[in-house]
């Protein structure tokens, strides 16, 4: 599933194409994704201008001049691709034919086309009054953004205090911190030297103090690399992300630990149905 860096990469790719532009046609090619699409979605989108493109956790939020916001979640296999919209004087390329899993297609007044493709249909879209966006069921219970000012040592120390769930599970709890996923929690815990098996409430304040900036750095590096492409994820121009080439533990089971002088190999354990990758020697 695309995590925060992948969704932020997509948002940044869409921003210059969508922000300030008007949707002249919305082609809704099926009535549902993971859940039914919003009623009258076509008429609620057509003719509307996108004022702002934001991200909350793993959701893209397109604020419309109608007073509504389009909420987009990529799910497991969703991708958003941009076609057309060449600069003035550039050679014109015909828009490619739509594919089987192109479920929502937005054409803009610039000639650009934005296509939501989702083979497994675990993605989601909804429309919500912008003034009520924070109360939307998909967003209402989310914790602070890990790259925002509300996520800091004191906050995380308080949220982890007394918790007997593993630190890995605590960081994946979207009520604790929004947008973190399996890949980047594994990578951050490795860099912080914290075992994913350690009880969250038994991580010292000193180690939490180092974990918070490490989480920020890992996410920032992943965004800079365009995210991680393991299966379906693509950037908006169709290119792969590149952060998977920089994994230190994730998806490296039985590979030598990258820490100089460490004789151990990366191990994999299953926690709450998800694979955790770590080095038993470097992470305690």
Curated annotation (Swiss-Prot):
Active-site annotation: 2 (schiff-base intermediate with dna), 3 (proton donor), 58 (proton donor), 274 (proton donor)
SMART domains: Fapy_DNA_glyco, H2TH
GO biological process per UniProt: base-excision repair
Entry GO MF terms: 8-oxo-7,8-dihydroguanine DNA N-glycosylase activity; class I DNA-(apurinic or apyrimidinic site) endonuclease activity; damaged DNA binding; zinc ion binding
EC numbers: 3.2.2.23, 4.2.99.18
Function: Involved in base excision repair of DNA damaged by oxidation or by mutagenic agents. Acts as a DNA glycosylase that recognizes and removes damaged bases. Has a preference for oxidized purines, such as 7,8-dihydro-8-oxoguanine (8-oxoG). Has AP (apurinic/apyrimidinic) lyase activity and introduces nicks in the DNA strand. Cleaves the DNA backbone by beta-delta elimination to generate a single-strand break at the site of the removed base with both 3'- and 5'-phosphates.
Record protein name field: Formamidopyrimidine-DNA glycosylase
Organism: Dinoroseobacter shibae (strain DSM 16493 / NCIMB 14021 / DFL 12)
